Amino acid sequence: MSVAGLSGARAATAAPTLSGEVILTLSGQVGTPETGATTAFDLGMLDSLPQREIVTATPWHEGTPRFSGPTIDSVLEAAQARGAMLIIRALNDYASDMPVEDARTIPVILATRIDGKVISVRDKGPIFVIYPFDQQPELFNEVYFTRSVWQVTAIEVMG
């Protein structure tokens, strides 16, 4: 299994090639059979994808921080992901399942910044899954809190 930046036909239009430190790896049902089953992203590649901002209260922050980053859906598209379930893993090996349907129907983001600043590992970075809790109050519950993984480093796409 090879690790590469974006592969296939979308690589030229979706994001630049890998040039910095890998902060996110997608594995499983990604890419094409010819390119392998792992796609790596650095911060620049994630920044090149369509960005979204969510201002929302969370159980883990004071006030209503402004989170920004690419939607999970755009990351899945860039990695040519196909599947129904995501296993999102953190630095400490915590993992949570997220239905791909969440990414397709809710503007969930892989936040790389809080209030315009890159999220450090100490502040729950490099990537934090953020749901639009204030915009969709029905999401403010334990089901979605467990899917809001912080210190994300890997996503496995399952069938």
Which residue stretches match the model-derived regions?
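N-terminal intrinsically disordered, low-complexity segments enriched in P/E/S/T
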Residues: 10-159
